[in-house]
Amino acid sequence: QIIATPIMVPNKLIPRRDENGEKYYVYFTEETIKKIAYAFAQSKNNDKINHEHDMDSMVDDVYVAESWIVDESNNDKSNVYGYSLDKGTWFGLFKVDNDEYWRDFIKTGKVKGVSVEGYFINKLTKLI
């Protein structure tokens, strides 16, 4: 049970909401995404997966099995999975060995994507 998906896409405005429900946008350059991906790996976060950014809702037996930064859009391993992504995109393969999570959240479409934990990104701002 594998999920193949972009983790972060560069040079796009991404809508978010703050704690008061106010809308704002975040934006990441290719270089920033590369720094985030490397820091994520260096911090050994590959198996620290939670549900909906809830640190009290860690998901066992789900991990990033593989990830990379797209270098050539038309000649990238992500093409095999049906993607044509911008240079600088962080792409990943998530292995889901948790049958219950796969059945209840992935297969039902309740979980539609991945997001790098905000806390992790906030810590990273000190590195950039």
Where do the language-model regions lie?
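Signature of dsDNA virion morphogenesis modules
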Residues: 1-128
